[in-house]
Amino acid sequence: MFEKILVPVDGSETSWKAMEEAKKLAEAFRGEMVVVNVIQPYNNAALLVVPLDQATISQGNEELTKIGNSVLETAKEKMQDFKGKKEFLLEVGHPSERIIAVSKEKACTSIVIGSRGPAGTAEFFLGSVSSKVSQYASVPVLIVK
């Protein structure tokens, strides 16, 4: 079950806790880890309340990509002591959908995910990501508080 663990990280404290738990499991079972950050791009459909021009949307998406890469760099630093095989991915799309898709694409045997994302207005939304992943994933899901 822990031969290849997918760990979504978003920079929140719970995602780092999930990564640490996944690391322990991977070490104990001599497994691999796939660490993923999913950015959800801006588009006009998502911004119906305040329509923005394409240049502003593109600039926002570039910033999201920078943030996603920064989260993955932090993950790489935190994973330096892990001796097993590890992979780091930046994905674009709806978080729960991409997490489930990556788990299939990479033939992961389990998912270890934090229970909530960053605090603030996104907290409810990101908490629903772990809920959707646990409901629709085809592999076992461990939710870390």
Residue ranges of each PLM-predicted region?
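Small/aliphatic-rich secondary-structure junction motif
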Residues: 3-55, 78
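General small-molecule cofactor/ligand-binding pocket signal
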Residues: 36, 87-91, 142
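Short, hinge-like loop/turn segments at secondary-structure boundaries
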Residues: 50-54, 105-107, 129-130
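A short acidic, glycine-rich active-site loop
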Residues: 54-69
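Structural beta-alpha unit
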Residues: 77-111
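Glycine-rich, Arg-bearing micro-motifs that act as flexible, cationic patches
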Residues: 110-135
